[in-house]
């Protein structure tokens, strides 16, 4: 600090000290920084993408004294706020209300034949999202972060430079946090594929579809199929194999498939769309079912109002002109980074879905903040630990999972060193209801001390109960630690501390 102005010493205001520290950290990077071109605006930190990860990193950097800017071409908040987690959770809550209405009579209430209005919930949902957009805008303004509206592409310059609407911007530290986009089949693969929509289009629907076909077996497909079915749409879920969520623990994969079918979703197994045609009564799908050991059969699904592709997500990196600065990607376009979120180009970083690892909003936020602390607070070891990240699927009933699946644990520790505890029961909520859902739980333990390395569950309340158990797994709790915890009765969560 001796080389800094006297005003930035011990007695300086916190904001000035933070700015000085940020400047010191930025200057501490190895290599000789090149001055920007005369027609280029310069910042300490330039973030491409105004989604959860980018905004979290920019705001944390600003708190630490960096002069930051965010480039965003659309609405602030990214996928999560606009076409993901937030509006999805509103629709899931709506679907849960619909399910509970079926149980009112069993709980002693007079028959409730409430008529559902898609228009009402859509209007309220969209208004809520709009309020969040405004909050994000205000937060950036309060943090003195400049917002640059437009599409960013890397351009020529003495150091990594970004061009937006004909203007150039640069910084010693540039973060790419552009997220991902839904995958859509190419017309050459499936003629008429463009007649379908994606999860983005789901939030643009003006009416509840009468007949829906969801294609995909991942969590997005499962969630949307469950929502539409619960709200009254005749729904089919088309999957290539015989189970959904095949990357999850086998217990969850099997049980979720069963619960979907019990809830009235038609699960079309070993089935794929071959062609889509538009008719006077909607869409007509030609599908092929190829059950192993049997001859493939072709059938038609007529009068489809909503065909929704939920077959994965692609990195939103195509328009960035990454080759201009030589940033390396994989074959799908995911930006390659190391454990500290560094790309192969000095001073350029990436977080979130564009990297293709753990596509979850809290992961992008945590990684972005850790990066800001490393760059502007001199915390050189600041990085996100990607192990034991908890996740929830808002299915019906919801799924909670953290840590290793049984198969992953066996692969890591050996079959003889893994012990499984599991249970299945009917939640007390259903003690008096005609409608039933199960709750299933599995605890994966490793080695002699029976360290808990994985917890997987599906049932009412599993979404909310997971967070606390995830802390225990992250801290290295053992089965004995769970056993020594007094149960809360009567709850579903007590099952995890009474497993035998």
UniProtKB/Swiss-Prot annotation:
Subunit structure: Homodimer; disulfide-linked.
Biological classification of the source: Eukaryota, Metazoa, Chordata, Craniata, Vertebrata
Gene3D superfamilies per the UniProt record, alphabetical: 3.30.390.30, FAD/NAD(P)-binding domain
Molecular-function GO term, any one: flavin adenine dinucleotide binding
Family: Belongs to the class-I pyridine nucleotide-disulfide oxidoreductase family.
GO biological process, one term: cell redox homeostasis
Cysteine disulfide partners in this protein: 80-85
Keywords assigned by UniProt, alphabetized: Acetylation, Cytoplasm, Disulfide bond, FAD, Flavoprotein, Mitochondrion, NADP, Oxidoreductase, Redox-active center, Transit peptide
Protein name as catalogued: Glutathione reductase, mitochondrial
């Amino acid at each position: 600090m001796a080389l800094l102005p006297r005003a930035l010493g011990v007695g300086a205001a916190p904001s000035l000290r933070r700015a000085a520290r940020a400047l010191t950290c930025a200057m501490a990077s190895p290599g000789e920084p090149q001055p920007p071109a005369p027609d280029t605006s310069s910042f300490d930190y330039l973030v491409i993408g105004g989604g959860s990860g980018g905004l979290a990193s920019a705001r944390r950097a600003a708190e630490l004294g960096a002069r930051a800017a965010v480039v965003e071409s659309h609405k602030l908040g990214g996928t999560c706020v606009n076409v993901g987690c937030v509006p999805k959770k509103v629709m899931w809550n709506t679907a849960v209300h619909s399910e509970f209405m079926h149980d009112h009579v069993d709980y002693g209430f007079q028959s409730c034949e409430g008529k559902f209005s898609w228009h009402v919930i859509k209007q309220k949902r969209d208004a809520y999202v709009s309020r969040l957009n405004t909050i994000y805008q205000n937060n950036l303004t309060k943090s003195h972060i400049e917002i640059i509206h437009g599409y960013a592409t890397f351009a020529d310059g003495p150091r990594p430079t970004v061009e937006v609407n004909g203007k150039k911007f640069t910084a010693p530290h540039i973060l790419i946090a552009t997220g991902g986009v839904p995958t859509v089949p190419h017309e050459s693969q499936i003629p008429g594929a463009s007649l379908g929509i994606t999860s983005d289009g789901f939030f643009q629907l003006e009416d509840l579809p009468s007949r829906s076909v969801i294609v995909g077996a991942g969590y997005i497909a499962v969630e949307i199929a469950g929502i539409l079915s619960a709200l009254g749409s005749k729904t089919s879920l088309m999957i290539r194999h015989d189970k959904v969520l095949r990357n999850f623990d086998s217990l969850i994969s099997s049980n979720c498939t069963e619960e979907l079918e019990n809830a009235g979703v038609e699960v079309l197994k070993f089935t794929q769309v071959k062609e889509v045609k538009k008719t006077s009564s909607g869409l007509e799908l030609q599908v092929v079912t190829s059950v192993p050991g049997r001859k493939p059969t072709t059938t038609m699904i007529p009068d489809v109002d909503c065909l929704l592709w939920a077959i994965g997500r692609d990195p939103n990196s195509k328009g960035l002109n990454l080759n201009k600065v030589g940033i390396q990607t994989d074959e799908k376009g995911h930006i390659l980074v190391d454990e500290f979120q560094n790309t192969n180009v000095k001073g350029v970083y990436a977080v979130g879905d564009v990297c293709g690892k753990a596509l979850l909003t809290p992961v992008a936020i945590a990684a972005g903040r850790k990066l800001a602390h490393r760059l502007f607070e001199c915390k050189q070891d600041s990085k996100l630990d990607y192990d034991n990240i908890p996740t929830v699927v808002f299915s019906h009933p919801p799924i909670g999972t953290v840590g290793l699946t049984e198969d992953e644990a066996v692969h890591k520790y050996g079959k003889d060193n893994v012990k499984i505890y599991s249970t299945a029961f009917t939640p007390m909520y259903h003690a008096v209801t005609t409608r039933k859902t199960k709750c299933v739980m599995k605890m994966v333990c490793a080695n002699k001390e029976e360290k808990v390395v994985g917890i997987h569950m599906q049932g009412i309340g599993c979404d909310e109960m997971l967070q606390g158990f995830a802390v225990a797994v992250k801290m290295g709790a053992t089965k004995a630690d769970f056993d020594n915890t007094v149960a809360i009765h009567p709850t579903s969560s007590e099952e995890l501390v009474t497993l035998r």
